[in-house]
Regions:
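Short, basic interhelical loop/turn and adjoining N-cap
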Residues: 93-94, 186-190
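Active-site palm subdomain of RNA-directed nucleic acid polymerases
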Residues: 155-177
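Adenine-nucleotide phosphate-binding core of ATP-dependent small-molecule kinases
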Residues: 141-159
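Helical catalytic core of nucleic-acid polymerases
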Residues: 19-143
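Catalytic palm active-site di-aspartate
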Residues: 41-42, 103, 172-185
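Polymerase palm active-site segment centered on the conserved acidic dipeptide of motif C
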Residues: 188-202
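Extended, Lys/Arg-enriched charged tracts that mediate electrostatic binding to polyanionic substrates
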Residues: 1-21
Length: 202
């Protein structure tokens, strides 16, 4: 880039030249110091951080929370939604992206509880749905939850993972795109070790 910009927003997310590029462009056209790159990201990022928030709000032995946590930790949350509502997704060529949009509408949107997306989510996770709606109402701002989860995401990425990467891998150059970290391929094993350690213990 002949001009590089970066700015942290009010919720801790870093915006740069890289964040405005499509994933395919970053993957197929960018290098770091002439070296091939790859990225690692948080599976089902926003639902993952919601699961961490819910541990303080629900009984951790609750079967619904256990299922939700297992799905997001294994990156299977959107697949679970698709599996239970095949008719809703049958006409879409990118079902996972559609399931992600559905989830974001429920968690972060100014949508009513009677919307089809809300009813689908509530059918699978009624207690978690009630918590989400309750937070929106109690805070008087439907954006509160999304802002909180973005702050948690930023703390995880920058406060923990990126911080440790720079401490443990001398001379490495990386860039981030919200919940993902891109690095030279030669550092794969060490970066993955650091990332997985924080992910497991968060």
């Amino acid at each position: 880039f002949s001009y590089f910009f970066f700015i942290f927003d009010d919720y801790g997310r870093l915006h740069t030249n890289f964040t405005v590029l499509k994933k395919e462009i970053r993957k197929n056209n960018l290098k770091i110091n002439g070296e091939n790159i790859e990225e690692i990201d948080i599976p089902n990022s926003q639902p993952f951080f919601l699961s961490r928030l819910l541990r303080d709000e629900m009984d951790i032995s609750d079967p619904e929370l256990k299922l939700f946590t297992e799905l997001v930790e294994n990156g299977m949350f959107y697949d679970y939604i698709i599996y239970h509502f095949p008719e809703y997704f049958k006409e879409d060529n990118d079902s996972r992206n559609m399931a992600k949009k559905l989830t974001y509408k429920v968690l972060f949107g100014h949508n009513g509880i009677k919307s089809i997306q809300s009813q689908m989510f509530k059918e699978l996770f009624p207690k978690i749905f009630d918590y989400v709606i309750g937070v929106k109402k109690s805070k008087g701002d439907y954006r509160y939850l999304s802002h909180l989860l973005m702050k948690m995401e930023s703390d995880f990425v920058f406060g923990k993972v990126v911080n440790d990467i720079y401490k443990q891998i001398r001379g490495i150059n990386i860039f981030t795109v919200h919940d993902s970290i891109t690095y030279p391929v030669k550092y794969r094993d060490k970066v993955k070790q650091i990332f997985d350690s924080h992910f497991k213990n968060y």
